[in-house]
Curated annotation (Swiss-Prot):
This is Methionine--tRNA ligase. It comes from Paracidovorax citrulli (strain AAC00-1). Homodimer. CDD domains: Anticodon_Ia_Met (cd07957), MetRS_core (cd00814), tRNA_bind_EcMetRS_like (cd02800). GO terms for biological process: methionyl-tRNA aminoacylation. Is required not only for elongation of protein synthesis but also for the initiation of all mRNA translation through initiator tRNA(fMet) aminoacylation. Its cofactor is Zn(2+). GO terms for cellular component: cytosol. It catalyses: tRNA(Met) + L-methionine + ATP = L-methionyl-tRNA(Met) + AMP + diphosphate. The gene is metG. Residues 600-706 form the tRNA-binding domain. It is an enzyme of class 6 (ligase). PROSITE patterns: AA_TRNA_LIGASE_I, TRBD. It is found in: Cytoplasm. A motif ('HIGH' region) lies at residues 13-23.
Length: 706
């Protein structure tokens, strides 16, 4: 069977500001799907571009004292830190002001003209008498003619999704001057979406499985009778005004001086322009590529732009003689902390660059969003407590720690070489391999929530196996070498499979694991096979830190001067970076303490301790009560201020290092008989996090740290 050939896009961000978290969510969703397809052997071209045209950019550039071209170029220059920071791997990032887009937009227009679907009409258009210019749709506001929501834009309603002409607005006003606009006549060009050919095509295209069922049902309503602002009714789809008057930053319409394409005509053409630019850079033929009948064209978009992508765009392509999309995947919006709307001044904004600047792992967010997105267009919520629990307990506690529970024994006792799994281990691995098809199917349907959920259920089974085998105890018993190697081999083989299943979500971590396991880049074709007896793995390196509550607090911290204009995200990140750079003058944020003698150090008795039990301390949000076995025939009670970094159940059964000869200290909650060692940065606000020391496998309770 030939490999699939897929052309994938995300919605083009408007080039008047930095990426926000909604952009990043969409790009991560698409990136996961693209990575999965490549792991299946598909040939994928994944492209994006900046949407650069329109009066808003023209006006913003004027205010900034720049040309529109320079304004959008400066915005484009800031895209890289976001995309690289979150491991979003577009094959090409382009611009709708590029020559390819000018050329393709004009070609499509001429083809639609030749098809008899472009009509010239004289219309009355709003004109700002104070600014002496025709007003772009987005600079006219008023009451929606359908749902009567106030302060809606002149081309579509953000409340009900209605699309209309600016003159349909009730009580309009200029967003530039506040003046009441006056109507002036102007010749405009219309794409006749009401033409029976367009209607028949779209009725079939929107209902043949290219859209999610809930989206298809919504679109179906738009073919019914619509109510006009004056109370009359009209049947079916309305025609689309595709032109704007000068002054306007955009693509001039052929043979129509002073007339420009409306931004929504040339913006989706930017998908094709970016693809064309990519192929030409590779020396490939764009025309040959798009003419391939096996090519699949897929768009990822938000639910706020469904109209443009399910009516205008496919009709433009169809009747200009081009391929229509095979799928339009629609996602919902992202809210924060139980449905709150994003607001920096209320501390509910989630700034992507601030997230990265705080040292938060990009793959925490990729994992969390993947665990929420399910292939439907439902809204999802970023909840800080849920985020911390899913990352610390599931991603790290269940998955990442599997390797650390076995790798050290294999390296130290068996030269890093795998053995053969025991009978239970072999059955477990077969169960893991059997789920490859179901997990792949979930990724195909963009149901990453299910893919993650199924993988974590498998991780639970692996951890049950480890807990039953107790390799840390086998390592201390005479004559259990074979059992120890078999148990650890099963862990590593299972870890490889789990990593394979999560690789589309966690590409950076997967690359680390591939290097550690000494394997080629994992694909779904590798699921049936095992590493095999005798395979040598490398030395295990720590793969991922836990989320610290202080990082989340800093992420949602309300700005000190909420009423003041917010600094651009890039500036905030630069300031965070500068602060971090200043802190590095002292290692770990603190200067090295004065020197001591070896005799001073010898007074401190550091011992390996097994955490037998761990529980929260009632009345304290910072402390955990640890029950420690230091190999002295009794258990010790130690209080440690690590509750912000660890859940009690995560620590039980783990080894750590403690100060064993510290004088007992009477505290409010009881007596503490020692101190657990943990690392943290001197500047906790800039570098939050507490990291309990964890010795390598092979250390046993009571051993002294020398």
């Amino acid at each position: 069977m030939p490999a699939r050939k897929i052309f994938v896009t995300t919605a083009l961000p408007y080039a008047n500001g930095n990426f926000h978290i909604g952009h990043i969510m969409e790009y991560i969703q698409a990136d996961i799907w693209v990575r999965f397809q490549r792991m299946q052997g598909a040939e994928v071209n994944f492209v994006g571009a900046d949407d650069t045209h329109g009066a808003p950019i023209m006006i913003a550039a004027e205010k900034a004292g720049k040309t529109p071209q320079q304004f959008v170029a400066d915005i484009a220059a800031g895209r890289k830190p976001y995309l690289e920071g979150f491991h979003i791997r577009f094959d090409n990032w382009h611009s709708t002001d590029a020559p390819e887009n000018h050329e393709l937009a004009r070609q499509i227009y001429r083809d639609l003209q030749a098809a008899g679907l472009i009509e010239t009409r004289t219309i009355e258009q709003f004109f700002d008498p104070e600014k002496n210019m025709f007003l772009p749709d987005r600079f006219i506001k008023g009451e929606c003619p359908r749902c009567h929501a106030r302060d809606q834009y002149g081309d579509n309603c953000e409340n009900c999704g209605a699309v209309y002409a600016p003159t349909d607005l009730i009580e309009p006003y200029s967003a530039l001057s506040g003046a009441k606009p006056v109507l002036k006549s102007s010749d405009h060009f219309f794409f006749q979406l009401s033409d029976p050919r367009c209607v028949a095509f779209l009725q079939e295209w929107t209902q043949d499985g290219r859209l999610q069922p809930e989206v298809a049902n919504k679109v179906k309503e738009w073919f019914s009778v619509r109510t006009n602002p004056d109370g009359t009714t009209s049947e079916g789809l309305g025609d689309w005004d595709i032109s704007r008057d000068a002054p306007y930053f955009g693509i001039e319409i052929p043979d129509a001086p002073g007339k420009y394409f409306y931004v929504w005509l040339d913006a989706p053409v930017g998908y094709l322009a970016s693809l064309k630019n990519l192929l030409e850079k590779r020396g490939q033929s764009y025309d040959d590529y798009v003419a391939d009948p096996q090519l699949e064209q897929v768009h990822f978009i938000g639910k706020d732009i469904v109209t443009f992508h399910t009516l205008f765009w496919p009709a433009m392509l169809k009747f200009s003689g081009r391929k229509t999309p095979d799928a339009v995947f629609v996602h919902g919006f992202l809210t924060v902390n139980n449905g709150e709307k994003m607001s920096k001044s209320r501390g509910t904004g989630l700034d992507p660059l601030k997230y990265l600047g705080l040292g938060m792992n990009a793959e925490w967010l990729r994992y969390y969003l993947a665990a929420k997105l399910n292939g439907r267009n439902e809204d999802i919520d970023f909840n800080a407590e849920d985020f911390m629990a899913r990352v610390n307990s599931d991603l790290i506690g269940k998955f990442v720690n599997i390797a650390s529970r076995a790798a050290g024994f294999l390296t130290k006792r068996f030269g890093g070489r795998l053995g053969a799994p025991d009978a239970d281990g072999a059955a477990l691995l077969e169960a893991l391999r059997a789920q490859a098809g179901a997990i792949a199917e979930a990724y195909e349907r963009r149901d990453t929530a299910r893919a993650v959920r199924e993988t974590m259920l498998l991780a639970d089974r692996v951890n049950e196996y480890v807990d039953a085998r107790k390799p840390w105890e086998l390592a201390k018993q005479e004559g259990q070498e074979a059992a120890l190697q078999a148990a650890c081999t099963t862990c590593i083989e299972a870890f490889r499979l789990l990593t394979l299943y999560l690789k589309p979500v966690l590409p950076a971590l997967a690359a680390q694991v591939e290097a550690f396991l000494n394997v080629q880049p994992l694909t779904f074709a590798d699921a049936p096979a095992l590493l095999g007896e005798g395979h040598a793995i490398g030395a295990y390196q720590h793969l991922m830190q836990r989320v610290d509550i202080k990082q989340l607090e800093a992420l949602f911290e309300v700005p000190a001067a909420a009423a003041a204009p917010a600094a651009p995200a890039a500036n905030a990140a630069a300031e965070a970076s500068a602060a971090a750079g200043a802190a590095t003058e002292a290692p770990g944020g603190e200067h090295i303490a004065p020197t001591i003698t070896i005799d001073d150090f010898a007074k401190i008795d550091l011992r390996i301790a097994l955490i037998v039990n761990c529980e929260p301390v009632e009345g304290s949000t910072k402390l955990l009560r640890l029950t420690l076995d230091v190999g002295e025939g009794r258990h010790r009670n130690v209080f440690s201020g690590i509750a912000s970094a660890y859940r009690p159940e995560e620590l039980v059964g783990k080894l750590t290092v403690m100060v064993a000869n510290l004088a007992p200290r009477k505290m409010k909650f009881g007596v503490s008989e020692g101190m657990v060692l943990a690392a943290s940065h001197g500047d906790e606000k800039a570098h939050p996090g507490i990291h309990v020391l964890n010795p390598w496998p092979g250390a046993t309770p009571g051993m002294r740290v020398r």
